[in-house]
Amino acid sequence: MLLPIPDVLSPAQLSQLRAQLDVADWADGRITAGHQSAQAKDNAQLPEDSAVAREAGALVLEALARSSTFFSAVLPRRIYPPLFNRYSGGQSFGYHVDNAIRYDRSRGGADPVRTDVSATLFLSDPDSYDGGELVIEDTYGTQSVKLPAGHLVIYPGTSLHRVMPVTRGARVACFFWTQSMLRDAAQRRLLFELDVSIRRLTQDTPGHPSLIQLTGVYHNLLRQWADV
């Protein structure tokens, strides 16, 4: 499921993040790439162990914790610490698939995270740079994504994707992976659609007896499918 989630960051949070990142020391982005993707990757990235990356990542995690849409769509079990990248001067990232397992360096690299869901949080206004579209190959064909600053897009970690060359300005973004309680993307989609329907029915027909039954169906499916 490819899903844009608007306004994950407030204007104040976005301003705080950009103030931190604008004065940060960036490194070669290939430091976090696997063997295959390193050959296609050309960008700058904040070192994972830098103080700026840790502080900025904590702010992003706080914002995600307040997003009911993110929780409903992803059903997160573990979130890999958010990373930050920057593209400018023609830099790009060719087609690749994210590594299936990431090792959380903040925990000494001992804890594996299965990358069920990939996510990009845009931090640059789309009018401030040319190019830089996130191009994702999914079930319905090729999707090109370029969202306003503060907006998030999530998509299956199994997706073939790329970042187009940035020919003007700079594209700054946060990216991370989530291990879901449900490893199956089809199950996540079904539960998300069911949750959205229950929320809408709750608004349209509050107190309807069927809502209790539907909510029970949701939780029983989650109980049956969840890997916790």
Swiss-Prot record:
It is an enzyme of class 1 (oxidoreductase). Disulfide bonds: none annotated. PROSITE patterns: FE2OG_OXY. This is PKHD-type hydroxylase XCV3086. Fe cation binds at H96, D98, H161. One of its GO terms (molecular function) is L-ascorbic acid binding. Binds 1 Fe(2+) ion per subunit. Its EC number is 1.14.11.-. GO terms for biological process: DNA damage response; intracellular iron ion homeostasis. Pfam families: 2OG-FeII_Oxy_3 (PF13640), PKHD_C (PF18331).
